[in-house]
Regions:
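Bacterial N-terminal signal peptides
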Residues: 4-14
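Secondary-structure boundary elements
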Residues: 42-46, 53-175, 211
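Hydrophobic/aromatic-rich core segments of domains that either
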Residues: 142-149, 159-171, 175-176, 181-270
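Beta-strand-rich domain onsets/edges
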Residues: 266-300
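Extracellular beta-sheet/turn segments enriched in Thr/Pro/Gly and aliphatic residues
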Residues: 282-295, 360-380
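A short, amphipathic beta-strand motif
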Residues: 299-309
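Short, ordered, surface-exposed loop/turn motifs in non-cytosolic proteins
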Residues: 308-329, 347-348
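Short Pro-Gly-centered beta-turn/loop motif in secreted/extracellular proteins
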Residues: 334-352, 356-357, 363-367
Length: 380
């Protein structure tokens, strides 16, 4: 009898351990991430335990690839809601079943793009965006519709007066203003909310040294780019920055083009507002943008028109000289700072650039070079 009691006690003691072991279904990368969670470990384990079995791969992906700061702060309710809504969207759209698992996990599921404030934007964007894309047949078509409609609805536009470069959607909506990065975050999140794989892409500095830029790539049987809040009626893979991107240099850290990734990689996405922060993984995608430089036979003139307070103005601009009949409209404050009206002119010739009744005489330089011409228009 004593032996039986001893064996029974041993079996009973073993049962909780066995059950506990079975409940911990996750793999080594998740276990390693949990070790970095500190006091928040219980919240992550709660999310892992509660997630439906058909969503386990997604929750494991998130936890295994989270930045340390998120491991130590994000709560189970946040993670469970984010994951559930991502799967819900996948079932609601025509293209959901065709999205490769790799793109779903890395470019639909994640709750953040770079280092913006973490917030549960997915529910609001799902409700706003699903009616916009409901009749679309492809993720690319859906992205185009969102880019053409959402910013008007949200009343958010580009502005250098925004509070921060890396604003979350709610921060940009509250101000009605955002940087190219803030606009890209909104478009990426809106796309992800309706199962359009999307990611931020950018360069720390154009090769011509006219500044940095951020835009969006969406997946539709391959990656395609678009400028956030800059939809081109002709479709994806068009934008004012195409020429600048063609000059990118893959092996130059500051002049290369990077796509942000949630999944860990061996390089980081340069955050121009926080260059010491190397916590956002990235992929160098310069090869898809850079083109062999054809020998140029013209001199490029980029025109900026401003008022007395240096605010950019959208006004008619003409160029007269050897080559007549050139005209266009300068960019106003709602256009990206680096988006300038461009004229390709014969080299070493004299021209007159006119805007708002103000004339400026210029002499073009050598072929292949460029110059920014700024014209200040007096107040009316």
């Amino acid at each position: 009898v004593g032996i039986r009691v001893t064996l029974l006690a041993a079996l009973l003691a073993a049962c909780p351990a066995t059950a506990d072991s079975a409940a911990r279904w996750w793999d080594a990368p998740v276990a390693d991430a949990l070790k970095k969670a500190g006091d928040n470990r219980a919240e992550l384990e709660k999310a892992l335990a509660a997630v439906p079995k058909d969503q386990r791969a997604a929750m494991a992906f998130l936890v295994a690839n989270m930045p340390d700061g998120d491991l130590q702060k994000l709560k189970s309710d946040f993670l469970l809601a984010n994951t559930d809504l991502a799967y819900k969207a996948r079932k609601e759209v025509a293209w959901g079943k065709d999205i490769p698992e790799e793109q779903f996990l890395n470019d639909v599921l994640p709750y953040a793009n770079v280092d913006e404030t973490r917030e549960l934007w997915r529910k609001d964007f799902f409700e706003r965006c699903l009616p916009i894309v409901k009749e679309c047949k492809t993720p690319g078509e859906a992205a185009q519709k969102l880019n053409g409609n959402l910013f008007k609805t949200l009343k958010v536009k580009y502005s250098t007066e925004r509070k921060a470069a890396n604003q979350s959607p709610s921060e940009s909506i509250a101000q009605g203003k955002a940087s190219c990065t803030g606009l890209s975050i909104i478009l990426c999140d809106a796309c992800r909310a309706v199962c359009v794989p999307a990611r931020l892409v950018g360069t720390p500095l154009w090769a011509n040294k006219r500044g940095n830029h951020t835009w969006v790539e969406v997946w539709d049987n391959g990656w395609h780019f678009t400028g956030a809040c800059e939809p081109d009626p002709s479709g994806l893979d068009r934008g004012w920055f195409v020429g600048d991107a063609a000059q990118a240099k893959k092996d130059s850290f500051e002049h290369a083009i990077y796509a942000a990734s949630f999944k860990k990689t061996d390089q980081h996405f340069p955050l121009v507002w926080a260059m010491r922060n190397k916590n956002v993984p990235a992929e160098n995608v310069t090869d898809r943008y850079a083109k062999p430089a054809a020998k140029s036979e013209t001199f490029r003139v980029l025109v900026r028109v401003v008022d007395s307070s240096k605010k950019r103005l959208a006004v008619a601009v003409t160029v007269t000289g050897e080559k007549t009949g050139l005209s266009g409209t300068s960019r106003g404050e709602s256009a990206d700072t680096n988006d300038l009206l461009t004229f390709d002119l014969p080299p070493a010739k004299e021209f007159v650039v006119t805007a708002g009744g103000v004339e400026k005489k210029i002499t073009t330089g050598k072929a292949g070079e460029q110059r920014v011409v700024e014209i200040q228009v007096p107040a009316k």
